[in-house]
């Protein structure tokens, strides 16, 4: 099944990569060594780079979802986030052209949760918390997956960060298969799988959580960075390969 996955998970044409890299100039701090994930395959996904105060998003106007979301966490930020009140005010991101963005109505009665890629629980400022509810940071997620298995993965990641000696870089995103399901009038793509890559730079180690976007999905053993690259076709942290 994995071999049949489309690498449109987070791929774009070469000139789109240059465009994205240029636009991420104001938020390169969320990427390890300031390096934007390498894009090797040619898929036209109408990508746009979006900078937020606590994370960065590569958004696709074709899927109407993020392709990946990058964060930089550390012990202090995770501890501060515990006291930050959740807002729950979802909104369509006006920075995106109307034809490229998801709208609140797309998720209404869809049977899917509005699943955060950069979790609200990671946000250590009021501004970051509010911004995390942008639909540019959201994918259609199976409700029980979002509230149980995926929530456990998010909590485990924060727990690890509190024990880390330095900054930890996290990249989260959806993976779509060839028979993609859509929701709403804008045909927002529903992921087949979700991944969360964790890179502890000071310890020089990385791993990824990989889970099916289904209510009955169970948390499996984390996969290696090399396996994530193989499954997605994306080199998220070039330094780890080079």
Describe the residue ranges of each PLM region.
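Domain-level detector for secreted/extracellular nuclease and nuclease-toxin modules, and
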Residues: 15-242
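Sec-dependent N-terminal signal peptides
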Residues: 5-14
